[in-house]
Amino acid sequence: MIHSRALRVVGSYGAILLAGVIACAATRVGQSGAARLQIVRADTAALRKKLDSIADAHHGIVGYSVIDLETGARINRRGDETFSTASLIKVAILVTVYDLVAKGQLSLDDPLTVLKIDQVPGSGVAQFLHNGTVLTVHDAAWLMSTISDNTATNLLLDRIIIRRVWAKMDSLGLPHTRVHSKSFLRNSSVAMDSSVKYGFGVTTPNEMAHLFELMALGKAVNPAADSAMLDILEHNTTDFMLQRYLEGARAAHKDGETNAVRTECTLWYLRNRVVACVLTKENTDQRWVLDNEAQLTLANMGLAIVNAFGGVPPAPPSS
């Protein structure tokens, strides 16, 4: 996946940036524990009307799925229609990695060696590391999920095998959520016809939203693993789509971008926990600029969803 936020460095700066990205986990202080705010019963009919209005104005196809985890309320548009994921499918890879760890078939400390032959373009820093650099499974999972590192993603797929991602998604009742190949390596596809149609991966708004719902409920792998994965996704660096107008909102999220595709799925920790997945395809505006139409569409939908649930809650008082 190539996009405007791709972190590009050369020489020794790659290793420096890599260390900084991984180290941020040790220094970031998340929002926590203050007294729980009263939940909001959103007017979902009004929210649906607002989201449909935004989607209707978009020059492309928009699907969405929104779930209020506190009340169980759900709304969707084209919820069961398949869309290209771009890098959003990396969430399914992350879940499979942690599932294999939980089963004792993989360790987060297992080494992964970066070889020149493994390095692919697009997002990330691992493509710039020197031949023979050793990461751990945890390092690669972190890089894949926070800066959408394509080389780190491929190292993980080599270790876990693509079909295991399919099997894990099937076990969760997500039969249309599929990764097809390694990133930027179409010839590694295990489903070439689907690769040609959808690219790197495919899902539906309802299925990807349900995957985030399962993580929020501790049912994707187990409560400890799901909590760890959501913590990683809270460190995602993308802030120009669903999160654009929501400064201060706590969110675990992942996005994807190709020329004609913009996607993002998020778990917001508002007064309610709210999952939202917005997928777009066949976008007329294919510019790689901040104000790309699809990115603005997602930004406006994100604002509408959060406002329907009472807006961004106040930050907890500092201790």
Language model region names:
Residues 99-142:
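Active-site-proximal loop and beta-strand segments within enzyme catalytic domains
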Residues 46-79, 278:
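A short, well-structured edge-of-sheet supersecondary motif
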Residues 61, 133-136, 141, 154-212:
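Mid-domain, small-residue-enriched loop/turn segments at the edges of structured enzyme/sensor domains
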Residues 36-41, 77-84, 124-131, 139-143, ...:
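Second-shell loop/turn segments in exported
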Residues 18-41:
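Bacterial Sec-dependent signal peptides at the C-terminal "C-region" and cleavage site
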Residues 69-70, 108-125, 160-161, 183-187, ...:
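Acidic helix-start/capping segments at beta-turn-to-alpha-helix junctions
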Residues 72, 84-112, 276:
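Active-site SXXK
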Residues 33-54, 159-161, 210-240, 246-250, ...:
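Structured C-terminal helix/loop/strand segments within mature extracytoplasmic catalytic/sensor domains
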